[in-house]
Every structure is written in structure tokens, then in C-alpha cells.
Design a protein with these regions (language model features):
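Hydrophobic alpha-helical membrane-embedded segments
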Residues: 12-22, 92-103
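Membrane-helix exit/interface motif
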Residues: 27, 43-44, 54, 64-76, ...
Length: 157
């Protein structure tokens, strides 16, 4: 069971890190090429679509499985392996902290701007959203990648 939990931690964290990397290197650069009038509604639709279903499962699993792997005692796990799993869990938890305290409030402000009366110009909405969101997303991507590497290292011990 402990080996399975660590394997699930590696897989879920790897899936999450890959998703973050695709957003960082493909989706956001693609959206950056859009006009303000195209970018703002496109990002709103992404924010409505992404945090559901499979993504939500992976988002939760990338913290739950490392925590479970750490909680279950393992015969023969070295102190180094335990510390690597703990470090991976800390990176995943910090990733969630950035998401919950940074990206989600920006997403919520973007959604609220659609209903504002009078609505703010898309150029102002984009300026308030894009650079801060991208900066926070870079942090999330780096934390997710670090968590993945740390958990892979723990699994290889």
C-alpha cells in the first residue's frame, strides 16, 4: 500500500505539473496574442471550464496522495525518502496556497468585471489581471515541478 500511495502521489503531481506547464508555455502565450476584446472573454470561459471534473480531482490528489504517502509508515524508507516526500508535500501545499490566495481571487475579479455596471473597458480588465495572474502561475508551475521531482526522487530510493 505505501508503494501504491507514493506512486499515486508521483502520478497525480506529475499530471498537475504537466497541466501547469502547458498553461505556462502554450495556453497563456497563445492568449497573449489576442486583442483585449478577445482575451478577456476567452480567459473568463477558461476559468469557468477548468476547475471542474478531472482537473479538480488531480488538483486535490496532488496534495492528498503525498500526505497519505507520508502518513503511512514504510519499512525501510530512509530518512531521506521521508524528507523528500515531506518537501514534495510542502511544495504542493504552497502551490495550493498561491492558487487559493492569488489566482482564484484574480479569476473571481475577472468574472465579476463582466457583471459590473458600467463594465470596465477590456483593456483595463486585462491590465489588472494578466501580468499578476501570469506571475503567480509561474510560481505555481515551479512549485508543481519541484513537488514532482522531489516525489520521483523519493520513489527511486
Amino acid at each position: 500500500m505505501p508503494t501504491l500511495l507514493l506512486a499515486l502521489a508521483v502520478v497525480s503531481t506529475g499530471l498537475y505539473a504537466g497541466f501547469m506547464l502547458i498553461f505556462l508555455t502554450g495556453i497563456m502565450p497563445g492568449l497573449a496574442r489576442l486583442t483585449d476584446e478577445q482575451f478577456v472573454p476567452a480567459m473568463r470561459r477558461l476559468n469557468e471550464t477548468v476547475p471542474r471534473g478531472i482537473f479538480l480531482v488531480v488538483f486535490l490528489a496532488e496534495v492528498a496522495f503525498p500526505a497519505a504517502a507520508l502518513a503511512v509508515p514504510v519499512d525501510g524508507r530512509t530518512g531521506t525518502g521521508t524528507w523528500l516526500v515531506l518537501a514534495g508535500l510542502v511544495c504542493s501545499a504552497l502551490n495550493h496556497l498561491v492558487t487559493i490566495t492569488g489566482n482564484i481571487p484574480l479569476n473571481n475579479a475577472l468574472a465579476a468585471s463582466e457583471k459590473a455596471t458600467p463594465p470596465a473597458p477590456d483593456s483595463e480588465v486585462r491590465t489588472a489581471f494578466e501580468a499578476p495572474w501570469n506571475r503567480l502561475h509561474l510560481y505555481r508551475t515551479l512549485l508543481a515541478a519541484a513537488a514532482f521531482v522531489l516525489l520521483v526522487c523519493a520513489a527511486l530510493l
